[in-house]
Amino acid sequence: MQLSEWSVLLLLLKLASYIAIAGLAGTLLMRFMCGNSNVAGHQVISFYQFLKRWQITCVVTGSIAALLQVPIEAGAMAESGFMGMFDPFMLEIVWQSVIGDQATFRIPALIIALISACMWNVKSDDNVAGYKNGAVILIMLGFIAYSFTFTGHSANENGLVKSILTFHLI
């Protein structure tokens, strides 16, 4: 089997998406674990600022990967070079496939997660607001993880199998 440029691009895109989602899950886990720490205030704020930057970086990377997935898939199907990414017929085919369903499910969840990560006030003493903000990101992470069940081996499985896979991904 010969790897084309499109195959390499799609592999890199999936790798970026996986790393971004894993990074978002990791930063969220660290955020919740540090919520009850006994560390001095300024050190916690510095660490939270670090986590916030990484959350935003992960969500932006995931968003870019999700936005590029459809045109790159269309270009790979068109096999007509760079302009194949903008072929209306191929774009329509990809948007109407499970790849389009995955993108339409994942992109809004990533946008909401980005807004929530940007709105996280790390200097606030209001723990309830911080937990609500983290809960929104966690719910969006669940939606993003569920979007992975639209394609691949689990695409034809029932809801229970998809739920188990989503739980496993998180």
State where each predicted segment sits.
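Polytopic transmembrane helical bundles with strong interfacial aromatic enrichment
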Residues: 1-170
